[in-house]
């Protein structure tokens, strides 16, 4: 295989993007055509000692595959899809090691079978960040006329350790467990449909994920959508891990029609509210008030002019927190759910001492870029104050 890859390199592939590969491939193809049948069948054997993509930081070692195939070019859709008993050709797939910046697998093996216009893989289990990832029986179908690929499978993930994920930033430390249960996954050129749900046990509460779907999964313009339910998140545990400022209390909420395209959020409807719980205080630090005000208006609440005594108060009490936010057509809105006396509140104080955060521009809409700028400024107010004081 390596000599063939060298031709690609010499043909002008960008330096550093070339595949480095060593191994062998062989195959057999049988073609049968008569008045009743047009069939292409055969078998491909692949043995790769090592494949390396420096640009993607991907390394693959010890790949061995024996893949049979049968393409019945005259089989009509109405003839139906063959059952497992109609898959006469057996094969195998094994992988010694796969390593990427995000994942690493060792010792993967799977049996497969082929029938007319169909492949089927036996169930497969992988260890992933302390959890167990299971794929059920996977079937792939090929349309002989248009060449479209469809398929179905199932997937289950138990007890994945979020602390082990390679997505941690220097500002956020994510701990907890995750699990997914997708009893039915349907794949087509236009849509990846997923039935089931997932959950993340984080920050003393639960984040539930449901209604997953991927539109145009093979396109760069693919759209990923899901719904999210936020159940009893401990705000103290959450704000201990993000540079927002301390907030205490219990939070519930939902995110509907959360949609991503080209790696960025495209639309959502978010609503979160505090839930009183006996023995759990409800407080906002001054830094948290500043950062919430930055998100809602673009300006700090204290602006460096707050009385000196306020800087020594650990937390200001609040009676209720309620926020609604939407993203549509590159436009953000941010509003409070609490409206009293013609005033819209993001945070409402108790009857006596406490803190209010008022939305003074409830009808204002801002661009996605401006909201990203505000989010990037969150947590910087305290740093800026310290540098000025020094």
Regions found by a protein language model. Give the residues of each.
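Extended amphipathic, helix-rich lipid-handling scaffolds
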Residues: 1-58, 63-189, 193, 212-260, ...
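Outer-membrane beta-barrel pore domains and translocons
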Residues: 45-47, 156, 199-201, 273, ...
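Outer-membrane beta-barrel and related beta-rich outer-membrane complex signature
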Residues: 56, 280-291
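Short conserved micro-motifs at the rims of enzyme active sites and ligand-binding pockets
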Residues: 165-167, 238-241, 282-286, 334-338, ...
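Short edge-strand/loop segments of extracellular domains
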Residues: 202-205, 273-280
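Flexible glycine-/small-residue-rich
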Residues: 230, 274, 336
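C-terminal structural cap/anchor segments
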Residues: 254-261, 265-277
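A cross-taxonomic marker for long C-terminal extensions/tails that follow the last structured domain
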Residues: 316-352
């Amino acid at each position: 295989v390596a000599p063939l890859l060298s031709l690609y390199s010499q043909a002008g592939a960008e330096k550093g993007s070339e595949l480095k590969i060593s191994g062998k491939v062989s195959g057999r193809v049988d073609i049968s055509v008569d008045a009743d049948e047009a069939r292409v069948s055969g078998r491909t054997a692949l043995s790769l000692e090592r494949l390396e993509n420096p640009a993607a930081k991907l390394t693959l070692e010890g790949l061995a595959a024996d893949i049979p195939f049968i393409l019945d070019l005259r089989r009509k859709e109405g003839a139906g899809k063959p059952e497992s008993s109609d898959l006469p050709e057996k094969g195998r797939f094994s992988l010694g090691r796969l390593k990427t910046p995000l994942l690493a697998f060792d010792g993967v093996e799977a049996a497969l079978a082929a029938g007319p216009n169909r492949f089927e893989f036996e169930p497969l289990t992988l260890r992933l960040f302390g959890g167990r990832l299971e794929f059920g029986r996977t079937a792939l179908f090929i349309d002989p006329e248009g060449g479209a690929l469809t398929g179905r499978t199932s997937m289950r993930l138990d007890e994945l350790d979020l602390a082990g994920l390679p997505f941690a930033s220097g500002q956020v430390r994510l701990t907890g467990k995750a699990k997914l249960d997708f009893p039915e996954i349907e794949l087509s050129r236009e849509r990846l449909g997923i039935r089931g749900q997932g959950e993340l046990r984080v920050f003393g509460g639960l984040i539930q994920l449901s209604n997953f779907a991927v539109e145009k999964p093979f396109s760069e313009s693919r759209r990923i959508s899901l719904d999210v339910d936020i159940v009893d998140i401990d705000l103290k545990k959450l704000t201990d891990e993000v540079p927002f400022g301390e907030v205490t209390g219990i939070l519930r909420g939902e995110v509907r029609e959360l949609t991503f395209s080209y790696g960025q959020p495209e639309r959502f409807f978010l609503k979160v509210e505090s839930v009183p719980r006996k023995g759990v205080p409800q407080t906002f630090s001054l830094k948290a008030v500043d950062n919430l005000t930055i998100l809602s208006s673009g300006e700090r609440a204290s602006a460096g002019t707050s009385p000196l005594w306020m800087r020594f108060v650990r937390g200001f009490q609040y009676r209720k927190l309620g926020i609604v936010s939407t993203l549509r057509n590159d436009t953000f809105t941010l509003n409070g759910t609490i409206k009293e006396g013609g005033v819209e509140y993001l945070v409402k104080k108790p009857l006596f001492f406490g803190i209010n955060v008022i939305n003074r521009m409830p009808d204002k809409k801002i661009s996605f870029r401006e909201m990203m700028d505000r989010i990037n400024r969150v947590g910087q107010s305290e740093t800026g104050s310290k540098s000025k004081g020094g």
